[in-house]
Amino acid sequence: MRIPNVFLSYLRQVAVDGTLSSCSGVKSRKPVIAYGFDDSQDSLVDENDEKILEPFGYYRHLLKGKSARTVLMHCFNAFLGLPEDWVIGVTKAIEDLHNASLLIDDIEDESALRRGSPAAHMKYGIALTMNAGNLVYFTVLQDVYDLGMKTGGTQVANAMARIYTEEMIELHRGQGIEIWWRDQRSPPSVDQYIHMLEQKTGGLLRLGVRLLQCHPGVNNRADLSDIALRIGVYYQLRDDYINLMSTSYHDERGFAEDMTEGKYTFPMLHSLKRSPDSGLREILDLKPADIALKKKAIAIMQDTGSLVATRNLLGAVKNDLSGLVAEQRGDDYAMSAGLERFLEKLYIAE
């Protein structure tokens, strides 16, 4: 996939004159026309950004702390040996992109809560929240391009912008088809569902790895993308499971909230395939908020062996990950020690 030359020219010009900005550190365009009513135009731009990015700032504060994505990027760098400032730059881009995507996801999923607090659109409204999320998508692209220009010039910057665009397209394809399945009440096959997870959930981590490996001084061309992809898939399958089974998850998102949102998850799809006439589909189509009805649906999934099947699939992905990590590290166990510690904390106990 290629970014149009006219867009790349625009990006190059922006990198030179610094005419954009955001919370991500990119400079905002100053007003072109000034009529003398107010000479504090720099503060005007800053004030506007602060206002329009309030939903994003709210999530960044709500989700603060050393995230799994930050830890993972540093674990991957143990294989690559890249400068710390480069890893920090890529990690910040991934974190900002993740938080921005949550703003949009929570609107599209009609989620009322995020980490036990009101979702951003419940607090700031749909329009401002959506605009903030979309704005950060573009400011992150600018940050990625600037990082590439600063480190390796136009060739590296263009490669990073291309990779960012490719993965963002895949992410939106995954999110889009999940919404289509939900709104059309058309459950996908299990294979289709896993492919969607690769696009949507695995893609963000794969983006981070691909951006890291754009550094002009990278020597180790380890194929870490497959590892990143499977970690993302494992994360979502794990969420599918704990959404139905974990009381702490219920406290933060609501009991079996995936059902209320109308989502199809792996345990649901497995159960529908095993027993099409169990009554589960009729319950799911109601997008139930009633706890008793949700418990009935979970009981059906237990009867069809779907919760056990979910754990078995998680075990299979875990085995795949172990094999891929061993393949990339060779005999250098120290190289993969951080990643393996991370994975052990991620895995559901067998």
Swiss-Prot record:
InterPro entries: Isoprenoid_synthase_dom_sf, Polyprenyl_synt, Polyprenyl_synt_CS. Induction: Expression is up-regulated during pleuromutilin production. The record marks 137 as: Important for determining product chain length. GO terms for biological process: antibiotic biosynthetic process; terpenoid biosynthetic process. Dimethylallyl diphosphate binds at residues 114, 200-201, 236, 243, 263. GO terms for molecular function: (2E,6E)-farnesyl diphosphate synthase activity; dimethylallyltranstransferase activity; geranylgeranyl diphosphate synthase activity; metal ion binding. Mg(2+) 2 binds at residues 105, 109. Its cofactor is Mg(2+). Belongs to the FPP/GGPP synthase family. Geranylgeranyl pyrophosphate synthase; part of the gene cluster that mediates the biosynthesis of pleuromutilin, a tricyclic diterpene showing antibacterial properties. The geranylgeranyl diphosphate (GGPP) synthase catalyzes the first step in pleuromutilin biosynthesis. GGPP is then substrate of the premutilin synthase (PS) to yield premutilin. Premutilin synthase is a bifunctional enzyme composed of the fusion of a class II diterpene cyclase (DTC) and a class I diterpene synthase (DTS), with the corresponding domains and active sites containing characteristic aspartate-rich motifs. This is Geranylgeranyl pyrophosphate synthase.
